[in-house]
Structures are given as structure tokens and as C-alpha cells.
């Protein structure tokens, strides 16, 4: 396993798969792995992975074994301490995420909720208040 500046940890299998993807992508020289989150999914945020040509303004660049991982500063706190693995079974394969900041997640593992999400917290409070009014 390789630690990426203590923000994100990629397992050896994840590193090998990223290297494989980079090697099979035409013009792969200089590509980076972007890891991020977008609002959405059934739990609040969805994980996002992409091979990108370079870092953008506001990105944190995390050197990895043979490639760079880039994370936008707005996602760093949601991803800090996350472990990315690559798993293969007879029926599926893909990257998996173990995120200590995820307070809830969906069944597929692609979406998570965080206690730091003020809109979700406010929404839960409002829903609870509506339920108690109906009781």
C-alpha cells in the first residue's frame, strides 16, 4: 500500500490498475488520476475518478508511484484518510472506497453522506420535525 500525502491511500492493486489504465490510454504521458466528489447519488456525494491531462487551479497534487493524483481543495476534507482499492471478482471489477468521513453510504458503495454536509443535516432536521408534527 502506498500513502499519498496522508490524504488518500491507494493499495498496491489500485496503483497497478491505474498504471495499467495509463499504459493503455493513447497519449498517456503526463496524465494524472483525478479523485473527487460531486454532489448527488442516493447518499449525498458520489465519488469521481478520471484520467486528466494536468492539474487545475485549486488542485492539490499528490505524487504517487509513477503518476500523480490530483484532488481539488474543496474535496480534500471529504476524502482525507480514504483508502482506494481495486477488486476483481467473477462478476465484477472496479475501484472501491473506504472513507472514514462517510457517515452513511449506499449499497453500491459509489455514494456517501458526510456529517459535515450542512444541507443534508438541515434536511434531516426538517424531515424529523415534519414527522413529529404528523404524530
Curated annotation (Swiss-Prot):
Region ranges (Disordered): 106-135
Biological process per Gene Ontology, one example term: iron-sulfur cluster assembly
Biased composition (Low complexity): 106-115
SUPFAM superfamilies: HesB-like domain
Pfam families per UniProt: Fe-S_biosyn (PF01521)
Compositionally biased spans, kind Basic and acidic residues: 117-128
MF terms in GO: 2 iron, 2 sulfur cluster binding; 4 iron, 4 sulfur cluster binding; iron ion binding
Family, as annotated: Belongs to the HesB/IscA family.
Protein's name according to its UniProt entry: Uncharacterized protein in nifB-nifU intergenic region
Protein species of origin: Frankia alni
Upper taxonomic lineage: Bacteria, Bacillati, Actinomycetota, Actinomycetes, Frankiales
Amino acid at each position: 500500500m502506498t500513502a499519498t500525502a496522508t490524504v488518500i491511500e491507494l493499495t498496491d492493486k489500485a496503483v497497478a490498475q491505474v498504471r495499467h489504465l495509463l499504459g493503455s490510454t493513447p497519449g498517456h504521458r503526463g496524465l494524472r488520476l483525478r479523485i473527487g466528489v460531486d454532489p448527488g447519488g442516493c447518499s449525498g456525494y458520489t465519488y469521481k475518478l478520471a484520467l486528466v491531462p494536468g492539474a487545475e487551479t485549486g488542485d492539490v497534487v499528490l505524487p504517487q508511484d509513477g503518476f500523480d493524483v490530483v484532488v481539488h481543495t474543496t474535496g480534500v476534507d471529504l476524502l482525507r484518510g480514504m483508502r482506494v482499492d481495486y477488486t476483481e471478482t467473477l462478476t465484477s471489477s472496479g475501484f472501491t472506497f473506504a472513507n472514514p468521513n462517510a457517515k452513511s453510504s449506499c449499497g453500491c458503495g459509489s455514494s456517501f453522506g458526510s456529517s459535515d454536509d450542512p444541507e443534508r443535516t438541515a434536511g434531516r432536521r426538517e424531515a424529523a420535525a415534519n414527522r413529529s408534527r404528523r404524530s
